[in-house]
Amino acid sequence: VVSELSLQIAVGETLALVGESGSGKSVTALSVLRLLPSPPVSYPTGDIRFHGQSLLHADERTLRGVRGNRIAMIFQEPMVSLNPLHTLEKQLYEVLSLHRGMRKEAARGEILDCLERVGIRNAPRRLADYPHQLSGGERQRVMIAMALLTRPELLIADEPTTALDVSVQAQILTLLRELKQELNMGLLFITHNLSIVRQLADRVAVMQNGRCVEQNGCQALFSAPEHPYTRRLLDSEPSGDPVPLAPDAPVLLRAENLSIAFPIRKGLLRRVVDHNR
């Protein structure tokens, strides 16, 4: 699936890992924390080293000290990662209890501080909420807060803005940039969105069919790509120019004087008393 991949991330650096779906980006990220089932997954060659220590050959106890602690990960869909049966407070407290041994009383203040830092409004009130009560952007902010509670040295973000609308994407990217500078942490950012890469990355690694075909500084790669696949990838980036419309194009859909109302029901018999308009 991935073959002869070599890359490195410096302290405080953002490396964007880009490529089409199935190129091996997420598999690479999951391998950093040994989150792929082994067997069947194996690592015939190479190694992954964190501060010089092998992660591929580390025992489970060593990995527990790294996973979610010194290296944290944000996944693409927070509803899959957050437990729908537990409140935000319970899930965030579990992180501090497991990785930092904090008691609930001491943890609450740190949880509130972290939620406010990532832009969750009315944080004390939201602690009792369940994941389904949050918007998509709020859930992703909670995932970022959960990752940052342990003050990681490296944050892996796997397509963290894919399911969000453009305005929320911009907020999340700004937040990640600010937090990276504040904490001086490394960031491995996985995406297929080249416009995001331009905004966020210091360096870019391009993957194709499980191989890294090109690595370079962000500005250098966008201005002078060397590998044919990288050039095709950049050429596929939308220009933003709309397709010209023929002046005599027939009308496909029209709405005229449309109103939409929902009934307001009250009382024991749930009778309609008014409408929301």
Where are these regions (language model features)?
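Short catalytic/signature loops enriched in Gly
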Residues: 121-127, 215-276
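Conserved ABC transporter NBD signature motif
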Residues: 42-54
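Conserved ABC ATPase signature
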Residues: 129-134, 138
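A short, surface-exposed alpha-helical micro-motif characterized by mixed small hydrophobic
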Residues: 197-199
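A short, proline-enriched helix->beta-strand linker immediately N-terminal to the Walker B motif
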Residues: 149-153
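Conserved ABC ATPase "signature" region
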Residues: 106-125
